[in-house]
């Protein structure tokens, strides 16, 4: 188990994961725990500091979220952010009230006494900075022993401190990108105030995980479903490094992959990494079950159930399998233990979560402590090619949810050819690496066109390219018009059956990234 330098107690803020990510970017290992975690459980992790996150509650409400008061007696620094600041103020005898002017968005922060007696929280910061506010309550009176260390135009207590007790608090969100030098303030808290010196490195994590896998697996075998995506590829490569041929990696070709995808996976794992990849050709089974099905939820469920069916058939061929490997990431773990429990299901998940009862395997989740960007670094350490590690996310149901309506081989071929043109042009122009996800959607809408002297009545496709940090929110990519024109021209000229290309300029929310 990795030593925990900082613990973040989560009060339900949408930004809580960003706190952990910002610290980890500075090679500071931290974990997120629910706000109601008992102090004994916190002490067991031996942290050097604690951060209280923001949250939607109000401290003066009857059912307000409260922290174990023993946290303040652990003799380690504490930092409160937004609700965390209000929680600290209330817990130490100050007052918190509903603000007459709510603050949402950018605000100008003025740091006090920066030249004469600066707080260590603001070491190397400029005296005036733009920060991100998101609150409707405010600290009205400070508790004894606390002093203001920063103000904003709407708040005389934008940041406060009790230097003697090493307790600090901010009304704004330093973890959000809009907060200038926010990362520096978080670093100052961890490095200068908490005294964190250790640097968390991916190569150390990898060595530790390989040792743990070997100890856990012993002489048993591990079954691993490989999709060709980043997470499952890194899991498979890590397991093979740890246990060699005790790994049974299974790649199911469902007929819904992009052009050349199966061949790429086979080349990387069979040829480059020498992994004994088991390839199951299940294209006919998937497509026959999807025939005539147009409802997106039904398509997802059919694909999920059929995958389990194929996985089950292959698993029965191998004796001695005791473990099942999954590419669970840290955001999945956080959500499962979050303040409010798992989020409402917007779309059915396609992963292996519904395996049959007879598969009584013990789970191995070697990536469960990592965020996506950290998984990519592990992949590079393991020798996976950058083209695979830095690829855009691809949904488990594949191209089936990029075809509006029922799925058939002719439409899949059409979509593959259009999709590869889009990706080729984005890579050639340098925009592939600058965007989060890019794909073509076959709308199954026909329109009239003219090609040469002939009238056409062919398919319309939609190009979708988005920018995002983690996929939770996204904005459409503002691609140059000449690039969009080139993509459109090539698709229409090179893919028989398409005569019109449109560009999706919707953001998430309200739209989702995928169309289905």
Swiss-Prot record:
This protein's record includes keyword ATP-binding: yes
GMPS ATP-PPase domain ranges (all copies): 200-391
InterPro entries with a match to the protein in the record: Class_I_gatase-like, GATASE, GMP_synth_C, GMP_synth_GATase, GMP_synthase, GMPS_ATP_PPase_dom, NAD/GMP_synthase, Rossmann-like_a/b/a_fold
The keyword Glycoprotein is annotated on this UniProt entry: no
UniProt keywords, alphabetically: ATP-binding, Glutamine amidotransferase, GMP biosynthesis, Ligase, Nucleotide-binding, Purine biosynthesis
A GO CC term assigned to this protein in UniProt: cytosol
Signal peptide stretch: none
Coiled-coil residues: none
EC number(s) on file: 6.3.5.2
Pathway connected to this protein: Purine metabolism; GMP biosynthesis; GMP from XMP (L-Gln route): step 1/1
Active site per the UniProt annotation: 82, 173, 175
Binding site for ATP: 227-233
Domain Glutamine amidotransferase type-1: 5-199
NCBIfam families associated with the record: guaA_Cterm (TIGR00884), guaA_Nterm (TIGR00888), PRK00074.1 (NF000848)
Subunit structure and binding partners: Homodimer.
Function in brief: Catalyzes the synthesis of GMP from XMP.
Protein name listed in UniProt: GMP synthase [glutamine-hydrolyzing]
């Amino acid at each position: 188990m990795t030593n925990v330098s900082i613990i973040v107690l989560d009060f339900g803020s949408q930004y809580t994961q960003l706190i952990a990510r910002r610290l980890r970017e500075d090679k500071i290992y931290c974990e997120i725990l629910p706000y109601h975690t008992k102090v004994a459980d916190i002490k067991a992790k031996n942290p050097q500091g604690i951060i209280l996150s923001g949250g939607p509650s109000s401290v003066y409400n009857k059912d307000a979220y409260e922290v174990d008061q023993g946290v303040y007696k652990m003799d380690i620094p504490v930092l409160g952010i937004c609700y965390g600041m209000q929680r600290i103020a209330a817990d130490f005898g100050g007052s918190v009230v509903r603000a007459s002017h709510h603050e949402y968005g950018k605000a100008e922060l003025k740091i006090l006494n920066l030249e004469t007696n600066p707080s260590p929280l603001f070491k190397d910061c400029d005296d005036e900075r733009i920060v991100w506010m998101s609150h409707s309550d405010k600290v009205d009176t400070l508790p004894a022993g606390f002093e203001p260390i920063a103000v904003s135009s709407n708040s005389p207590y934008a940041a406060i401190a009790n230097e003697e007790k090493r307790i600090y608090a901010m009304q704004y969100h330093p973890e959000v990108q809009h907060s200038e030098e926010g990362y520096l303030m978080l670093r100052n808290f961890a490095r200068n105030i908490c005294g964190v010196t250790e640097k968390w490195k991916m190569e150390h994590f990898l060595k530790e995980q390989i040792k743990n896998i070997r100890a856990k697996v012993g002489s048993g075998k591990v079954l691993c479903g490989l999709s060709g995506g980043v997470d499952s590829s890194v899991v498979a490569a890590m397991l093979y490094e740890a246990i060699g041929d005790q790994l049974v990696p299974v790649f199911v070709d469902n007929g819904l992959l992009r052009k050349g995808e199966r061949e790429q996976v086979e080349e990387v794992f069979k040829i480059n990494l020498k992994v004994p990849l088991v390839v199951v050709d299940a294209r006919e089974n998937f497509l026959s079950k999807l025939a005539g099905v147009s409802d997106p939820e039904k398509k997802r469920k059919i694909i999920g159930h059929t995958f389990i069916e194929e996985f089950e058939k292959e698993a029965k061929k191998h004796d001695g399998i005791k473990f099942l490997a999954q590419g669970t990431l840290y955001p999945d773990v956080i959500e499962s233990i979050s303040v409010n429990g798992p989020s409402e299901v917007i779309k059915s998940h396609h992963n292996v979560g519904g395996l049959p009862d007879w598969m009584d395997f013990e789970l191995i989740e070697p990536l469960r402590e990592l965020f996506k960007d950290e998984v990519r670094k592990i992949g590079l350490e393991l020798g996976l090619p950058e083209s695979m590690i830095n690829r855009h996310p691809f949904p488990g149901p594949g191209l089936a949810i990029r075809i509006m309506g029922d799925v058939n081989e002719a439409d899949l071929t059409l979509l593959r050819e259009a999709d590869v043109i889009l990706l080729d042009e984005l890579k050639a122009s340098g925009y592939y690496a600058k965007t989060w996800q890019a794909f073509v959607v076959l709308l199954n809408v026909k329109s009239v066109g003219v090609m040469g002297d002939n009238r056409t009545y062919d398919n319309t496709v939609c190009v979708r390219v988005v920018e995002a940090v983690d996929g939770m929110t996204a904005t459409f990519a503002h691609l140059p018009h000449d690039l969009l024109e080139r993509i459109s021209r090539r698709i229409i000229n090179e893919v028989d059956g398409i005569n019109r290309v449109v560009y999706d300029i919707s953001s998430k929310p309200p739209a989702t990234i995928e169309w289905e």
